[in-house]
């Protein structure tokens, strides 16, 4: 919002909500979703809901990470599934083309696929920032997760960033990457 204020842009509204329960009567010219769809599974229902938030000529921009070909759920089926349990509970790794099958209420206007090398670099940068600010972050984690869990969560986030760095850099960034979609009203 600071950037918006600096540029005298006043028609931006940031909403952070649980989309399972979210309702709003207000209509928007554009809706932007950043890394939310990975945490959802019923894309048909979600896109219907978002279409109701849009003006007649409105558009939806979606930024998600994706696999080039495979869609798979994040399932918590045991101790080894810590990432599914702690970071993506109930979510799914979508394939790049998965959203193309959900055009009942909104239709695809444009699709982009970005190499995973970008997210690899981003994950490494976040890891460095985290390591450089360990003391501050441990304090935040104490407030968030409790005294006994702060260091555990610090390590979980470190492993998360390392895992993402490796995953998105795998095979020169061609398998896992970032997908962008612009949907418009039907």
Region spans (language model):
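A short glycine-rich, Lys/Arg-flanked "PGG" loop and its adjoining helix->strand segment in the class I
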Residues: 44-59
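A short acidic, Gly/Pro-enriched loop at the edge of an enzyme's catalytic core
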Residues: 20-31
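Conserved SAM-binding strand-loop segment of SAM-dependent methyltransferases
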Residues: 6-21
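Alpha/beta-hydrolase-fold catalytic nucleophile elbow
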Residues: 63
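Substrate-binding/catalytic lobe of Class I Rossmann-like enzymes that use SAM or dcSAM, i.e.
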Residues: 66, 70-178, 184-186
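Conserved hydrophobic residues forming the short capping helix/wall of the S-adenosyl-L-methionine
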Residues: 1-4
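A short beta-strand submotif of the Rossmann-like class I SAM-dependent methyltransferase core
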Residues: 33-36
């Amino acid at each position: 919002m600071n950037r918006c204020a600096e540029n005298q842009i006043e028609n931006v509204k940031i909403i952070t909500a649980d989309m399972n329960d979210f309702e709003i009567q207000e209509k928007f010219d554009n809706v932007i979703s950043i890394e939310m769809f990975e945490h959802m599974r019923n894309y048909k229902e979600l896109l219907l809901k978002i279409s109701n938030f849009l003006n007649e000529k409105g558009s939806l921009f979606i930024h998600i990470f994706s696999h080039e070909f495979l869609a798979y759920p994040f399932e918590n089926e045991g101790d080894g599934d810590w990432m599914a349990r702690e970071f993506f509970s109930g979510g799914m790794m979508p394939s790049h083309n998965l959203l193309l099958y959900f055009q009942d209420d909104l239709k695809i206007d444009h699709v982009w696929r970005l190499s995973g090398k970008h997210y690899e670099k981003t994950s490494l940068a976040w890891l460095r920032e985290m390591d450089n600010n360990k003391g501050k972050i441990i304090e935040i984690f104490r407030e968030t997760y409790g005294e006994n869990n702060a260091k555990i969560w610090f390590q979980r986030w470190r492993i998360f960033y390392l895992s993402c760095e490796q995953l998105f850099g795998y095979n020169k960034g061609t398998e896992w990457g970032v997908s962008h979609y612009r949907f418009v009203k039907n």
